[in-house]
Amino acid sequence: MNTHVKPSKLIKGATGDWEIIIGLEVHAQVTSRSKLFSGASTQFGAEPNSNVSLVDAAMPGMLPVINEECVAQAVRTGLGLKAQINLRSVFDRKNYFYPDLPQGYQISQYKSPIVGEGIVIVDVSPTEQIEVGIERLHLEQDAGKSLHDQSATDSFVDLNRSGVALMEIVSKPDMRSADEARAYVSKLRTILRYLGTCDGNMEQGSLRADVNVSVRRPGEPFGTRCEIKNVNSIRFIGQAIETEARRQIGILEDGGVIDQETRLFDPGKGETRSMRSKEEAHDYRYFPDPDLLPLEFDQAYVDGLASALPELPDAKKARFMNDYGLPAYDAGVLVADKETADYYETTVNYNGVKRDPKLVANWVTGDVAAYANSVGLPVSQTHLTPAQIATLVDLISEEVISGKIAKDVLAILINEDKAGDPRTIVEARGLKQVTDTGAIEAAVDAIIAANPDKVAQAQAKPTMLGWFVGQVMKQTGGKANPQAVNEILKAKLGI
């Protein structure tokens, strides 16, 4: 494994190799009941303009008041990103005009953000791990929403989102492929969900990304970057990067130059298109907001929040590998979702019984996860309980049933007896494994007698043993103990 080493990810152009340089600005909606500078609700899906205070609507004389919970959530996130927490930060006005920005400016943080540099360790694949640097995290207000599809002649504005707290998490340009960018956003979302600082729901706009892409020849300075705004799914982030990189390579190989600009990704057409020329900081005329004092707190405040942080994904993965002996891949899959990790741990320790951790992991990440995906639910929200899966694993370990029969029992739990006890189901339906060697020998003898040609083939080619095992299992309804079947067949066939 290339731990903490970023391999070069080159793509082929018509005139040689190119390297993609990627940085992401992720906008994460802060989990809080009220907005950043007002007491209005942050409820999603409310009637248009029903969650709007006078501050959000920029009524004259209305002054912003900082929401302490949003500050705490930003600090928690910074701690989760192993980042520098700045004890003094400043809110600035970012000036621009848009119909859904009633103040005519956005309250953000420019020169003095609440969180400084940090790092995220990302598993790109089972054999590749990279570090992505965090440049900064700052708090800012979200804008409202312009609606252009309600009328043929008019546009409408919904200010429910106006003033909702966002954390803008700015990465360093450390990613070199779409796969790395996708893995980074997935890991970042997992960290935020563990911390409880953002729900990470991209469908509702709680997490969206501005994607900065440039290309260069290997070893050359960074090229001119273009920013793709408001990409709202991990899949689209990858597609936008690959599409934009190809566009830039085509221009450069034809002798053109890249214009620094803001672009939009159209997933339907599979292309990016120009939105506007890319603004520089001076275009926004940043200056400290005169209505807000600098935000200051002491180290004791930070330490108090740090002491109450939950176990985070990297620490949980390390513990699963150490305490349960799980391979890195299995541990990584389990901890990618906090509820799934909790479900696994409850299952493996159910009733104080020590179960085979790897076997439990195989069931949770295999058949149980497959069922959860088929019904569009997380593992923890299906009707399959840790108690049921623990009992199923116990029955396999006790050799009461085989793995194949266990799958049949799971199907019964899914389709017929949702609240059933696997042990009761096995008893009631006569699914116990046949361990009587006499009965198994009788089945083996019958199959050998009926297939003399196959016997000769198996003796010449031992891999044919699998055919005989299958026939015995079929004759016993899948109930024969597989280990006993193998041993008896080998003895009878002389292989």
UniProtKB/Swiss-Prot annotation:
Membership in a protein family: Belongs to the GatB/GatE family. GatB subfamily.
Name of the protein in question: Aspartyl/glutamyl-tRNA(Asn/Gln) amidotransferase subunit B
Enzyme class: ligase
One Gene Ontology term from the biological process aspect of the record: glutaminyl-tRNAGln biosynthesis via transamidation
MF term (GO), any: ATP binding
Organism, as annotated: Beijerinckia indica subsp. indica (strain ATCC 9039 / DSM 1715 / NCIMB 8712)
Enzyme Commission no: 6.3.5.-
Subunit relationships: Heterotrimer of A, B and C subunits.
Keyword Protein biosynthesis: yes
Matches recorded under Gene3D superfamilies: 1.10.10.410, GatB domain, N-terminal subdomain
Keyword set, alphabetical order: ATP-binding, Ligase, Nucleotide-binding, Protein biosynthesis
Catalytic activity: L-glutamyl-tRNA(Gln) + L-glutamine + ATP + H2O = L-glutaminyl-tRNA(Gln) + L-glutamate + ADP + phosphate + H(+); L-aspartyl-tRNA(Asn) + L-glutamine + ATP + H2O = L-asparaginyl-tRNA(Asn) + L-glutamate + ADP + phosphate + 2 H(+)
Function: Allows the formation of correctly charged Asn-tRNA(Asn) or Gln-tRNA(Gln) through the transamidation of misacylated Asp-tRNA(Asn) or Glu-tRNA(Gln) in organisms which lack either or both of asparaginyl-tRNA or glutaminyl-tRNA synthetases. The reaction takes place in the presence of glutamine and ATP through an activated phospho-Asp-tRNA(Asn) or phospho-Glu-tRNA(Gln).
